[in-house]
Amino acid sequence: MAKVTLKGLSHSYLKTQSSDADWAIRGVDIDWNDGGAYALLGPSGCGKTTLLNIISGLITPTKGDILFDDKVISGLNPVQRNIAQIFQFPVIYDTMTVYDNLAFPLRNRKIPEEEIKVKVHEIAEMLELSSTLNNRASSLTADGKQKISLGRGLVRSDVNAIMFDEPLTVIDPHLKWILRSKLKELHQKINRTMIYVTHDQTEALTFADQVVVMHEGQIVQTGTPVDLFEKPKHTFVGYFIGSPGMNVLPCQIKGSDVIVNGKKIETHQKIKKSNFDKTEVGVRPEFISFSNEGIPVKVLSVSNTGRHKIVDTESETGKIKIIAKFNEDIPSGSAFLKFKKEYTYTYGDSWIFE
């Protein structure tokens, strides 16, 4: 196991770079403590897999360093880095038994067979593969095959980190939840550094203690799931996390006042000055309520999810979604909205006012 540190990492697949768009990732700085559960979250093409492949040694970064336990390992090859990597699609040996698949990494390292037997049975029990150990791997279902891939990463006790690149892509939605829960349980048992790459917010937020959100090759926020939900530091984090995502509305800054649709609203921050090209207010649907005064809107539709109602409204400057209690009476036609001050934030050029 190891503490993983990334310092000033940037990478481009082009020989020359003339703009930010030429970089797959840029200016990445991360500290992941030994034994933690982490997630890299972002849409396709944001640089997640590039970053993962740099850590494992499959790609050499254009700039920056990778450190394990404060030692620079940028020049080491993938084998020397001692990383276990689990990919989107199960990588198994079909003609081997499940037992032999799990034992394979240990046999490559000349581990004594008795020790291999103990370790394989331990991991098989954790992953509920014990009853299939003598079966050929080709006979297993998609989730069973991915369990083998997970097991081969977990069976080694000498790895510096275990990295998962969208490991549940091919898994049925119900089985995803089961495997994700099992992975979380395994992390608590073996206490190894795990880095989970995904575009799925549910996977990231339920697995990781700390989530790194990436957007267009940059890290826009790192924090706990609660941090990311309650205080998005970038409007992208607000859009991307939450269902529905954060409402983001254009606003004007007049002195220390924040104006939305001609109405002054109170926000979490005290505004001192604004020299941004674009200013916006962000508030999640959970923190908006109907009121006798406030932002004027027109109620467009109401969807009952069973747990709550999602109300679509429209204001002068854009649509606003509200999450209301399932038994709450929703006005029809014209209405007014009030934003909860503690969770209403002002953004300048997409970044939160600090």
Model-derived regions: residue spans:
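The feature captures the beta-strand-to-loop junction immediately N-terminal to the Walker
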Residues: L41-P43
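ABC ATPase nucleotide-binding domain helices that frame the ATP-binding cleft
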Residues: T49-L52, I148-L150
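ABC ATPase nucleotide-binding domains
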Residues: N82, Q88, I92-K233
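Non-catalytic connector elements of ABC transporters
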Residues: D257-E354
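Conserved ABC transporter NBD signature motif
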Residues: G64-V72
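Helix-to-loop junction immediately C-terminal to a conserved catalytic motif
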Residues: S56
